[in-house]
Amino acid sequence: MSDRYQICVRCIMDTSDPEIDFDAEGVCSHCRRFEEVGRPVLERVGTPEGKRSLADLVERMKERGQGRDYDCVIGVSGGVDSTYVAYAVKTRGLRPLAVHCDTGWNSELAVKNIENIVTRLDIDLRTFVVDWEEMRDLQLAFFKASLANCDIPQDHAFLAALYRTAASERIPFIVTGSNLATESILPRAWGYNAGDLRHLRAVHRRFGTVPLRRYPTLGFVRRYFYYPVMRGIRTIPILDYLPYRKSDAKRIIREELGWRDYGGKHYESIFTRFFQAYYLPRKFGFDKRRAHLSSLVVSGELTRDEALREMGTPPHPQKELLEDKEYVAKKLGISVGEFERLLALPTRTYRDFPSSVALFGLKDRAVAWYRRRSRLRESGPARAG
């Protein structure tokens, strides 16, 4: 982190991101990347060409789904993005198979939201239950490693469960809730790549105690070669094809599906709520709301002043955060005192452990080159992985 504080003049990202940089006008690297990568995609949404791309995509999914029970796989967590994805695909006549990955941390509200989604939309649901002892040990390993992204064990399992289900059910499309309108900004230092299996295994090898025999994993080659090339599975970020505003999405799913709000982004998980609202700000000085709100600023849903006002409020009530800390410690099988000791350890970064960061960087550059060659406006915003 820089000793000299600076905040972007366009969004609200600042030097709490140790890898941020600013141009001569004070515009940050995240904003510049959004202008290069995100804005062309979002400006295409709703245009005649964009509408045609969406219609063609839906038609292709229906054609590939002929003779099968389902056209696509979707993940459901009870959160806004995944709930709106379920609504969007179902109202367009697609037959999704919903997959929920139960890592042991669902809030009651998340469970109720999922029940409402699948019931009201008449969607089949598969629940993938992760072995708790392995999940607990892996999450503890990340706390012992003193890394910023202690949510990797959950996020990696979610991803692996989607691909496993698509492959086992012979479903050629995974429709995800990742999107540029609300998620274009996330510093790598705050949330290193959950898809990096080499990194996950390196952390567990050093600090874990329970063998990962049933925990679902997804390696680089399997994700970017075996599944898309050998099995023909394509990942579709459908919200990048739609006009997507967080506030409008919440209103629609409340009215149509009986969805109930759970607070902050990804707070449907008790662990993630504690991780984002307590662990990251206290231990690292990272407040992920800054990235989430900056994403809404650059996409035009919020003004910069509105985002700054939101940052002036606590991420979650203090009393509830302390209750969450006790709950997380107890569920992980350690005392609050031992948990406090782990939280007080000197911080490390993902660079302190083996990873495939160079390989993912090469992949990203190859994708960027391909998009430039094929002209993004012709190929649409679909992603390969």
What are these regions (language model features)?
Residues M1-C72, A88-G385:
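Nucleotide-activated chemistry modules centered on ATP-dependent adenylation/adenylyltransferase
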